[in-house]
Amino acid sequence: MVQSDSPEELAQRAKPAWRLQQMPVQLSNFVSKTPLIGSEWPPTGDWRSANNNSLGDWNKCCVPGSEIPQHLGPFGNSSLTMLTAQQPGEKIHPDGGYVSPKEDGRKSSEHTNSYDVSASQSPSNDGAQSDSTSDEHIDVECMTETEMDTDEKDSTIKPEDQATPKLEEGSDSKPESTSVEGTSSNYQVTSEPVQMPQMPIPVIPSFLKNSLPAPIPITPTQSANVERSNSPSIEEALLLTLSQQQFAEVFAEAAKIRKSSSESIGFQRSGTSAFLNIEPKEMSMSSANNNNEEAPASTVSACSTPTTTTSASFCRPPGLGPVALPPTQNGQTPMLVCPICGFMCPSKFHFNSHMNTHGDHQCSMCDYTSRTEGRLKKHMRESHTVEEQLRAGFESEPAKESASSPKNLSLSKDGSATSPINEIFNLSTTMASILDSTNNAVSSTSTTEQPSALSALTLDMSSTPSLLSTLAHSSFGVSALDQIKAISENPSFMPEGGINLASALGVVSNAIKGDTPSPEKQSNGECRRSSSGKIKIFKCKQCGHQSLSKDDQWAHARTHIPAEKQLNCQHCNFVTEYKHHLEYHYRNHIGSKPFQCKKCAYNCVNKSMLNSHMKSHTNHYQFRCMDCTYATKYCHSLKLHLKKYNHRRVPEGIEMSGGDSSPPFTSDATITFSPLMKQEIKTETVEPVTSIAQPFPFNPMMGNHGLNFANHMLLNKHLDVGLMGLRNSVMSPLKCSACDFVASSADEKMRHSMSHILNSSNVPTSIASLYNSLNLPSFSHVAPDNDNALESMDCDVKIDDDNITESHCYEEMDQGSDSAVSPTGSSQISSGDEETKKCKSLSLEQISARANGNNSPMSNDSAMEKDGESADDAPHSPSDTTSVPSPPLHSSSIVAPIPITPQPNEFLQSILAQASLLGPLLANRPSAFYCDHCKIPFDTQQVLDSHMRFHTPGNPFMCSDCQYQAFNELSFALHMYQARHQ
């Protein structure tokens, strides 16, 4: 905003103007001499006299720079107004032949800015308008009130009753005031009326007309003290020529611009040339629009509200459940939202991969299940008719069949095959299959049952001599001769294409002898692509070679197969060293798939493929990951998972529940030991003891304290062993020793410790190996209470739910071992050595009594008698009859049958130490705080309530926090161990 000049400034400005009017106007008179530069100036003297020009001369020639209008307003404004060029501060008199330099510079600045503004704004693009209509673009209303007041202050005051047009600031058009100016110095305003039609209209570039919006108008205000000069300015003269209709159109355009600008937020273009380089893409697009269409201001991206875009592929919204789908903007791919957990991603591939984690896809027409949606669609296309698909609401495009597809190689009733193989061998089953089919056909003739799908059966060109022997020594009820007779009498049982039985049998014979005329070998040198478009890579199973085509893979396979063992296909470059592989390959050539699923229309070339397919009709996941809840029906899928995530497989001896076919777990059993594993416990060998040190690799435990650690090591399977002497040697019971986790309760800490055990790399596969892997810490500061601290512990293991206890672990080891270093086998060492008999382990009752803190109820003599009885019974055991005598013992103090080299394991030591503290707490817990679903007791009601909130009402094995569906209490417990829920 330009400040109004004071009277003193006007008087000062008028004085040099009056003086300059007496001077010549030529510029050469002002600058008559060349200026002095550098060393040309004299060192002393008056610099005025030394200079060639006077200060007044330089002032006369100096042209002040134009004032740059401010385009950007305050930052908080929702829109920016454009300030136009300034008007001259002095009144121009008709008799004045000279204009001051400052005034001339101001007019030149006004000329430049006025042209830029008028050229950059043109909301109406109608090129067919008349000249009078184009006058709307001439703006005479851009001056502010201050500029008007400055221009109007003069000794001559215009009467207020004189009709003057009302000016509006910020109109859509700008004047071309300089078009009627002659020169900047000789311009004079005459009293003659201005003829507007004769004024030249500047040519405005087309791209400026259509690209930039008009400036935002400001509501006009009327000043009470408006002074007008006697002679109207050029803008006023132009304004007088506008009609009332043109004024209405100008106001209408201003209203449109005001409305659009009020709806936008942010920066807007002011319409000047300073913004011509903003977003050239949108300018080019807008210039290509129709001239009759109005270019709205809202198309400028700077005016619109900035939208937050993310570069991440996935985003999980806060909370659970489905999330509203965000609207599509600028043609972007819409986000795919999981209806179960709210997972979102724009990729269909990743969305399908995520949906596979929620369960199987089941066919609505049969009991087929699949982990992927693509396999399910393929099954529905190939295994069900079109009517069934339409009835089930499944609509999809027909599957694209490749040139080598068996369907393309088979003949139809109304056409013949074009391949030479199909012209000669229209075969789809083996001879064994044709005999089976004819047997069914003969039996169906007697029962007047229409044979189903027998007309499509044909012979197999890849038959081997074993098939002919099957034909000769058939075990079917009907003889082979009767079956062949039935085929010859009923043409519907014959192969299609006009091949009779004799020619078919001849073809099989020629195929067996190798005399089959082989056409030109098919080429498989092209690169294959997967369904996702990626090039398929064929990897060699014997080395790291990779090929991009089948021919390259087969050519490389010849380097691994000896020449005398290579079996080559006659129709392509396939090579193998196994006959059954060649037979399967031939079946693929001719479409022979005799193995068919009884539950769907799937058929394949061998039995193993059918067995693998039958898993899709079951819900039993026998292959499981130990480190996560991943389970699959196929071993190959599990191997890929383990390789990808570096996880471990659940040992075969441990059967973890999952699926409908798995046996249900009882209240307190989570891991079942198979008979194979029990046999492993019995048959585990024991090395002879050569050391006379302690019987166990760890320090002896106190005999009158109990440790309930197996309740957590084996998930509610505990060993009643006294280890309460460890109470004073452990760290804080609520902090994990393996990590920085701090539990809020004892149960939470134990569950956290179990997650470390389950995720450890060395998982024991038997009770004995588990027992041996537990290296207890050394507690030398604990004083023994009695002299029996060196005795062994009772390691009875409760496995079954009916509380049937296995035999003592020492005795079971002795029964299956080949050595004789055991309490029962020690009698074979020396029958006359009494000291050797005394070194045998005590009986089960003695160990249990000492573990409970009681003295032995038997005397030493009775103990010796029991030892003698066990020694007498030892030769009757099967293991003792086949055992090998062990080397002589060097000490009589050896008690333990399982000596192991100490392997320090600080983590397991800390777990056992923590479990010793929790033993009495877990044993004395009140039964009121008990989870009926997980069969786990808790200390307090608060802990139980915190646990129960994860059970979904109506579906207790579904996690209410992440919607994970568990199979039973074990899988739910594993999920709670692995998931970090708050």
Curated annotation (Swiss-Prot):
Taxonomic source organism: Caenorhabditis elegans
Please list the GO terms describing molecular function.
DNA-binding transcription factor activity, RNA polymerase II-specific; RNA polymerase II transcription regulatory region sequence-specific DNA binding; zinc ion binding
Compositionally biased spans, kind Basic and acidic residues = 101-110, 153-175, 863-875
Family classification: Belongs to the hunchback C2H2-type zinc-finger protein family.
Q: Name one GO cellular component term.
A: nucleus
Gene behind this protein: hbl-1
Which keywords does UniProt give here?
Developmental protein, DNA-binding, Metal-binding, Nucleus, Repeat, Zinc, Zinc-finger
Please give the Pfam families that the UniProt record associates with this protein: zf-C2H2 (PF00096)
SMART domains xrefs: ZnF_C2H2 (SM00355)
InterPro entries linked: Znf_C2H2_sf, Znf_C2H2_type
Record GO biological process: egg-laying behavior; embryo development ending in birth or egg hatching; negative regulation of transcription by RNA polymerase II; nematode larval development; protein metabolic process; regulation of development, heterochronic; regulation of transcription by RNA polymerase II
Q: Where is the composition biased (Acidic residues)?
A: 142-152
UniProt-listed SUPFAM superfamilies: beta-beta-alpha zinc fingers
**Start and end residues of each stretch annotated as Disordered:** 87-194, 377-415, 811-896
What name is this protein filed under?
Answer: Hunchback-like protein
